[in-house]
């Protein structure tokens, strides 16, 4: 993307949105670590209202984009319109909030220089918050709502296992292997690269208080797309795992997008060096070909015994209904958790001086953008 400045065309950076955390059927899940590979300077926002943290990140991202740098926008599963962080790969820098760090990365590795950012200091004055007793009740209710959501997701996973079992029993594994071999050959041919491939683990989408959210259109923009159709248990994730492993073996950088419901499953693989994306295109991230180069891989037609849907229709109906009910209930609990968190944070959020946040964010952006420019490594004041 280009824009004009004083008659000169300037290339604007590209923003890539995704999730690295998720509310999953296996509990809270964090995939941030791979996004920090190669990062040597990280600003970490200490506890502060989520909206204030996200506002600072948006400004930093915009400054980087205007400086022709690509950015990764890490969205929050608690509210997908807010950010967990922003990464500027070309500058080997990032700005995240402390809560996005997985526990095993606290403290950060020694090769990542860290600066603590205290947004709560940029306040215009104190606001009356919840009384201590009310605050304790709200915190307990928040924890209960999140816990209820995870219980519902776990119940949905048990139901989903029954759903998968029907199709696994009707599957031709020989046919699935033929499909995998065919698409390995089609995507990679005889090609390889003389380097070690990089694997980035992310989430394709996330269960949020607003429902299931994904960024498939943004992530696959400009790529040749293979849309995998099928059923639960029809081999979609297995095919994607095979393609990811093959890409890495051949030295390609591979983006591996995990299922936001079950992080042990894979929903999308992108190999940008080949201009290719292959993804599970079934609900809740169901898409249909809308680009001239889009192609469908139908695992049901290719690998499952004909008539399986019809043969098991009576068995499938209550499974599908029970799964949908559990997922809907889980989303309701997430929405309640968001409402409670907003109430808890509201007084502190109202006390934040957003103009000071904006001014400080531009300064932080300038520091982050200097790092890695022309090989320089910056060391801002206050480096921890």
Predicted regions and their residues:
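A detector of single, family-specific signature residues
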Residues: 27-28, 158, 297
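Short, Lys/Arg-enriched N-terminal segments with co-localized hydrophobic residues
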Residues: 1-10
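An accessory alpha-helical subdomain
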Residues: 134-190, 315-318, 322-367
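Glycine-rich phosphate-binding P-loop
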Residues: 41-61, 222-247, 384
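N-terminal pre-Walker A segment at the start of P-loop NTPase domains
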Residues: 10-34, 174, 181-217, 373-383
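A cross-family "folded-core" feature that marks the main globular domain of proteins
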Residues: 45, 72-75, 155, 162-203, ...
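Internal, well-ordered alpha/beta segment that forms a basic, Gly-enriched binding/recognition surface
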Residues: 110-150
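Conserved nucleotide-sensing/catalytic segment adjacent to the nucleotide-binding pocket
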Residues: 12-24, 41, 62-126, 248-324
